[in-house]
Amino acid sequence: AFVAADGQVKIYEAMDVTSLAHWTLIDSFPVGEGPSKDEEGNHCLSWCTSKFAAQMMVVGCAKDHVAKIFRQDLNNKWQACEVLAGHGGVVHDVSWAPNMGRSYHLIATACKDGHVRIFKLTDDSQGGALAGGWTRKMFNVECIADFADHNAEVWRVEWNITGTILSSSGDDGKVRLWKATYTGDWKCMSVVSAEDGPSAFLR
């Protein structure tokens, strides 16, 4: 899946897994307008990879300076649900953490305002109802970490395969690695610059 310049998410599927040169468009839906002419960047998205959750994705909505959770309703139509707010500029990147047995989800965002943010999504047992009688499970959204260590625009965030370490990169030319302590506080565990050798990752 990707977000086109016109704000449409387009989802493709390889109908024949033995021939990955051919992909078929299976769905398309709008998420909003792109950034204004005086802003750089565009939309971004990341899938929820959990095998035990319904199909979901988080989309960075450039012009709105937020990220939104999208998932399918009973008619298999994609709907905007929760909003990840609090950004002071265009959301350049989003990354949904792999869920390795956790009872909650983690989503990281990289923002033009120079901040890396981590959001925690926990199930709301009350659920919620949308127009048409569709009842869906909702998430309580909480920003549990907000870092400005890059002191510059942040462009990329990415989780490791277990969703326990987050990497971020920005215009300061550094990659920062973040990990939660035993108390649940997220801390920078390593900083790697372009001038550092491979041994920098072993610190």
Show the residue positions of the predicted features.
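A short, acidic, flexible beta-alpha connecting loop/helix-capping segment that sits on the rim
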Residues: 163, 172-174, 181-183, 192-196
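A conserved positional marker within WD40/Gbeta-like beta-propeller blades
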Residues: 8, 64-66, 115-117, 151, ...
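Conserved strand-to-loop turn within each blade of WD40 beta-propeller repeats
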Residues: 3-6, 14, 60-64, 109-113, ...
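Inter-blade linker and blade-boundary elements of WD-repeat/beta-propeller domains
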Residues: 10-50, 56, 66-95, 123-151, ...
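Structural hallmark of WD40 beta-propellers
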Residues: 1, 52-59, 101-108, 118, ...
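Loop/turn-rich, solvent-exposed surfaces of beta-rich toroidal or solenoidal domains
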Residues: 91-127
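C-terminal transmembrane module of eukaryotic multi-pass membrane proteins
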Residues: 149-164, 169-175
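Structural WD40 beta-propeller signal
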Residues: 48-50, 97-99, 160-162
